[in-house]
Amino acid sequence: MAGRLSFDMNEEACVYHVKDKHRDRKRIKKFLCGMDSLNKTTNVSEKVIDGFIEMDIDIEVENGRVTPITADEYIEDIAAMDDRFEVLYWLIIIGGDANRWRELRRECINHYNKVKVCNKMVNEYEYGFTIIESDDDEQGISGGWPKTSSSYRKDRWKLQNILTKERPGLTALFIFMMRLAGDYY
């Protein structure tokens, strides 16, 4: 998949089309560090860069902030894979603190406010998430963070541990709010 797209950017809104990424590792590193700026990250591991190189994705960034605007085609792709799922919102992010997660969630809900939100899922979980590995998007982890703060902290720590230790090849976090079609009406 790698190498299909071009790498382009402008000053107002940056759309990163990832192409010959093996020759542009410095720009990729700068981009990924920018995505994780809330954690004051100044470095990204070579494994993360390698994993990103293998992923065929477009990311839209406005004023240095990842936006869900380019998510529509991916939502369609994911939904087409399995018609049992309806994807309610989408994000891609690496790192970030709890307040930023909440802010991003609000942005997503506002962006897709015309989609019927599953009340059961919203009541039970602060976030829904699916993690997709760069080498095999069928090997994912799905779940949610309960709203209670202690559970949220515990589950978020567990997720970070998975990202950094158990599965270091994991390079990106795709966050979805999904429901089984028809199950929660």
Curated annotation (Swiss-Prot):
Organism per entry: Ostreid herpesvirus 1 (isolate France)
Name it. Uncharacterized protein ORF31
Q: Which domain of life is it from?
A: Viruses
